[in-house]
From Swiss-Prot:
Lineage, top ranks: Eukaryota, Fungi, Dikarya, Ascomycota, Taphrinomycotina
Alphabetized GO MF terms: amino acid transmembrane transporter activity
Cell membrane listed as a keyword: no
Protein name, as recorded: Uncharacterized amino-acid permease C460.01c
Membership in a protein family: Belongs to the amino acid-polyamine-organocation (APC) superfamily.
GO biological process: amino acid transmembrane transport
Main location: membrane
Keyword Phosphoprotein: yes
Keyword list, A-Z: Amino-acid transport, Membrane, Phosphoprotein, Transmembrane, Transmembrane helix, Transport
Length: 572
């Protein structure tokens, strides 16, 4: 056979037996045989489309068939804008109404500080163990199999429910323009999410890269505009200079209860920050990509959450009837701030940005739920058939189950009789999803503490790790403390609700996630009778990626210059 028009890659050298063929060669669509007979097999689009649904041929070193297709740019944009969505743009309205502007600024700052420590701990663990299931798999090994089982299902339920919840939010957001049946909008966005998932993790990464870029640009634009509005620089705004006149009126609405109630919605706003750890099994170079992504989280918290919400507190009164849950229409406080400045056209533009953000969070929710269910199957925490992965690296069965649950969003149709069922469902799901994040984030911190203690006890050097959290164990201790504090505050608000007496409905609506977690943990303990391993016997070697002298420092730098370099390296 002539080879003038076909050059063999190094993968084909010295192959003279069918059994010697690398599985990756088969996956590329080449015919097995001796070298002289190797030729590309041409397949039609239809044939290739259906072949992609067949079981994956090769697996990663951790036994997962997920493909490492996410690049550094994907991870950085996911870290910066991946969780900017309905929690910030819409959920902040109910936070402002319940707790007032001072409460929202303080609470979002506290949750932001907590997330700063959580994400750095997560970065260290994810670079060391870039495995399927992410931090849920790590918690199973380092904390307790029963607790790993609990938070894995807890995390899955979180995003499994968030998927139809965000579809519902899409329909609510469209009420700004029209009263068209919610089912129409739900159907459109459900189809969009299904199409994105059909193209695998690379499509998810590209879509998130584009949507996150748009969200970042829009939020920065709003910050600039909000400063101008507050200073009285908008000709159509007859209020003139606003300054701190609004925030002084009712800074802590509903007192201490209102202050505590903001924790749940703040947590929901920050949900998704941990995606960079969950995606570690699908990143092409975890040691390079993940540390950069982790460092971007600080800027997202500082700029996009703290600054934007501070400006919202300066511009919107907590008793405004148009805030989420107060009036007949639900308007984002971001859109409301532009409306009250009498700027024509721009509110519709920003409302479109909110819809883009909701689509992004919806897409991310399906990703998180499907990958978590796939990871649980690998640990034996879920039926084995959920581990099925096709040739595109899609956890196909897990993905289909999650997408099917999206049809639950059609419960909005029950509102035809004026029952307000969709609003009730939104409240219940928001409370469940928001509280469950504390369990996941607390587990990340606790896993990091145990990992560091075991790592030191077994005589290993941190210099061999690909990324070391500059916050160390103490940073994780602070993060864990904040998570426990948030759970206590939410328990108080659930037991003694704002403007009412203790009742079962409010308590379970606010603390249902804790009840579910207790049932799962006790149930697994009874079934498996798992135990907590000692630090000496804890398995930290399996799946651990070490890098010789990965944390080697420049010996020529010293003194103040060295300190500045360390600070810069921690945030940039």
């Amino acid at each position: 056979m002539s080879h003038n028009n076909f050059e063999l890659s190094p993968d084909y050298k010295d192959i003279d037996k069918k059994d010697d063929l690398n599985p990756s060669i088969v996956e590329k669509g080449y015919v097995e045989g001796v070298v002289d007979d190797v030729q590309p097999e041409r397949k039609s689009f239809i044939t290739k489309f259906f072949d992609d649904f067949k079981p994956a041929i090769s697996t990663d070193e951790d036994g997962s068939a997920l493909k490492r297709s996410l690049k550094a740019r994907h991870m950085q944009m996911i870290a910066i804008g991946g969780a900017i969505g309905s929690g910030l743009y819409v959920g902040s309205g109910s936070s402002l109404s319940d707790g007032g502007p001072a409460s929202i600024i303080i609470n979002y700052t506290l949750i932001g500080i907590m997330m700063f420590f959580v994400v750095y701990a997560l970065g260290e663990l994810s670079v060391a163990y870039p495995v399927a299931g992410g931090f849920n798999t790590i918690a199973t090994r380092f904390i307790d199999p029963a607790w790993g089982f609990t938070i894995s299902w807890n995390y899955f339920i979180n995003y499994f429910i968030t998927f139809p919840l965000e579809l519902t939010t899409c329909a609510i957001t469209f009420r700004f323009w029209t009263d068209i049946n919610s089912a129409a909008w739900i159907s459109i966005f459900l189809v969009i999410v299904i199409i994105i998932n059909l193209f695998g993790v690379r499509a998810y990464g590209e879509v998130e890269f584009i949507l996150s870029t748009l969200k970042v640009i829009a939020t920065l634009g709003f910050i600039i505009l909000a400063i101008i509005i507050n200073c009285g620089g908008v000709p159509t705004d007859h209020r003139g200079y606003i300054g701190g006149s609004i925030i002084k009126k009712d800074p802590f609405r509903h007192g201490f209860k209102g202050f505590c109630s903001v924790f749940t919605t703040a947590a929901f706003s920050f949900s998704g920050t941990e995606f960079i750890g969950l995606a570690a099994a699908e990143v092409d170079n975890p040691q390079k990509s993940l540390p950069h992504a982790v460092k971007q989280v600080f800027w997202r918290i500082a700029v996009f959450y703290i600054v934007s919400l501070t400006l919202i507190g300066l511009l919107i009164s907590p008793d405004d009837p148009n805030l989420m849950g107060n009036g007949s229409t639900s308007v984002s406080p971001f859109v409301l701030a532009i409306q009250e400045a009498n700027i024509k056209g721009l509110p519709s533009v920003f409302n479109a940005v909110i819809i883009i953000s909701v689509v992004s969070v919806t897409n991310s929710s399906t990703y998180a739920a499907a990958r978590t269910l796939h990871g649980m199957a690998g640990l034996g925490h879920a039926p084995k058939f959920f581990k099925y992965t096709d040739r595109l690296g899609r956890p196909l069965i897990a993905m289909v189950v999650v997408l099917l649950f999206g049809f639950f969003a059609y419960i909005n149709e029950a509102d035809k009789n004026g029952n307000d069922v969709s609003d009730t469902v939104f409240d219940w799901l928001l409370a469940l999803a928001g509280l469950s994040n504390f369990f996941s984030w607390g587990s990340i911190c606790l896993s990091h503490i145990i990992f560091r203690l075991a790592y030191k006890r077994q005589g290993r050097s941190l210099r061999d790790l690909g990324f070391v959290s500059p916050m160390g164990i103490w940073g994780s201790c602070i993060g864990l403390f904040f998570n426990i504090l948030c759970l206590m505050a939410q328990f108080y608000v659930s037991l003694f609700p704002i403007g009412g007496k203790p009742n079962a409905n409010d308590f379970f609506q606010g603390y249902l996630a804790a009840c579910v977690a207790i049932v799962f943990f006790v149930g697994y303990k009874i079934y498996d009778r798992s135990h907590v391993p000692s630090l000496d016997k804890l398995d930290i070697s399996t799946g651990l990626r070490t890098y010789e002298n990965s944390d080697e420092e420049d010996e020529t730098s010293s003194g103040f210059k060295h300190v500045l370099k360390k600070i810069y390296g921690a945030f940039c």
